[in-house]
Amino acid sequence: MTKNIHDQRILILDFGSQYTQLVARRIREIGVYCELWSWDVEEADIREFNPDGIILSGGPESVTEENSPRAPQYVFDSGVPVFGICYGMQTMAEQLGGKVATSTEREFGYAAVQVTGESALFADLETTQDVWMSHGDKVVEIPADFTKIAETDTCPYAAMANEEKKYYGVQFHPEVTHTKNGLKMLENFVLNACGCEGLWTSASIIEDAVARIKEQVGDDEVILGLSGGVDSSVVAMLAHRAIGDKLTCVFVDNGLLRLNEGEQVMEMFGDQFGLNIIKVDAEDRFLDALEGEAEPEAKRKIIGHVFVDIFDEESKKLKNAKWLAQGTIYPDVIESAASKTGKAHVIKSHHNVGGLPDDMEMGLVEPLRELFKDEVRKIGLELGLPYNMLYRHPFPGPGLGVRVLGEVKKEYCDLLRRADAIFIEELHAADLYHKVSQAFTVFLPVRSVGVMGDGRKYDWVVSLRAVETIDFMTAHWAHLPYDFLGKVSNRIINEVNGISRVVYDISGKPPATIEWE
């Protein structure tokens, strides 16, 4: 009998660390299902979830403060292995009888940890480990039934363990790539201490999702808004595998897409994969609605409202459609849940996080709501979607509507599309595209004097933007070679009639945002 991929599970309690979602992604990489919940979860919820192990994340608070977060007592009464990371180790130590003190100097950055004792956590690892530290407090006395298993020159208890209960604590962050063997430590905890197997694979996720879609919708028809982006594309492939022609995709070409994107979506999903697609050519409708509007937030709202209106109209034509499929992913669920309840553990509740009207009277099909973006891409590859589509740089929902600064006009969009296509084409040709995190072109609604042949011309300006980032929360501008930038600039000015000047944006985030609007 095939094992259910959700049967083995790890619970991660979030104490507010910027790395907490990264912990969850690492556990999934190991091949084990996990969920991320707020630290103040009710005991009954943990009992119902019935985890094979619990991880206490890092966090910005100080255990030495009176009202700082604590793990629920049931964590230590449940009988399952527990792994405390940074703040998680500190609250574990303090709650189980140890002592934590505020350090005179904050430890931040690389550190060499000396493994001082035998421990299942460090099985098959060297006695010296390069790790990433980020803490102010530190454990100064471990609980009576714990042993020290690692130290640094400035941190006497860099790791501790109660091997009998399978409780482990580390003062560093094993989830970040800076900790060289961090993934191995997490594997030792999840696979060895907790006894989990690697059931969570791309193939098994697809099999599970297809079965769940079939069970959920039965013989009913399903409608999906297909944008050509990663999430909706993967949902389309999963739903089509599950229910075939009972899926109808609605693709709205709003005139704000990249060069030839509409044709590419129809060719790939209609001609190549054989999906039922209704294409709505709505360029005029969107541009008419945007006429005269220059304020970015207002433009976003207009584009969103027009899309919803069109989708609503098309869905009403499909009398038998009882279900709406959406590309909601796990970070959307976490963010939406936290904003509504202050807690992140409502993965089971089916609330609409996609902005479509609540009166559509359809059930929601959200096969990606348990998945992180990197997992979505991996199952997309398994489903046969092309690498270059799945790993394409992020593109904003409003499309060129927020990359044309100020008022959006067809002329501006056409110029921007062609300039951006040249930039992206040259990035691929120079093998630079996948070395930057995001690259695009922005249309500036200002004219600049240029020289063409013997004459002068007075045409528009575009800006090239390329950034390097890990999490898109902060970003550095990409130091692209001057020769490369020169080539792109020359091509745009020579090939796109109407553009006389190309500039390169060298702003970091912060203070600037990645997108201009």
Swiss-Prot record:
Q: Which reaction does it catalyse?
A: XMP + L-glutamine + ATP + H2O = GMP + L-glutamate + AMP + diphosphate + 2 H(+)
Active-site residues (renumbered): C86 (nucleophile), H173, E175
Recorded E.C. number(s)? 6.3.5.2
Q: Any keyword Signal?
A: no
Annotated pathway: Purine metabolism; GMP biosynthesis; GMP from XMP (L-Gln route): step 1/1
Q: How does it assemble?
A: Homodimer.
- Please identify the protein, giving its name as recorded: GMP synthase [glutamine-hydrolyzing]
Tell me the lineage of the source organism. Bacteria, Pseudomonadati, Pseudomonadota, Gammaproteobacteria, Vibrionales
Provide the alphabetized UniProt keywords.
Answer: ATP-binding, Glutamine amidotransferase, GMP biosynthesis, Ligase, Nucleotide-binding, Purine biosynthesis
**Matches recorded under PANTHER family:** GMP SYNTHASE [GLUTAMINE-HYDROLYZING], GMP SYNTHASE-RELATED
- Cellular component terms per the entry's GO annotation: cytosol
Transmembrane segment boundaries: none
Q: Which InterPro entries does the entry link to? A: Class_I_gatase-like, GATASE, GMP_synth_C, GMP_synth_GATase, GMP_synthase, GMPS_ATP_PPase_dom, NAD/GMP_synthase, Rossmann-like_a/b/a_fold
Gene Ontology molecular function: any one:
ATP binding
Q: Does the keyword Hydrolase apply?
A: no
Could you say which residues bind ATP here?
S227, G228, G229, V230, D231, S232, S233
Please state what class of enzyme this protein is.
ligase
Question: Could you tell me which residue ranges the Glutamine amidotransferase type-1 domain spans?
Answer: 9-199
Q: Which residues form the GMPS ATP-PPase domain?
A: 200-392
Function in brief: Catalyzes the synthesis of GMP from XMP.
* Pfam family for this entry, one: GMP_synt_C
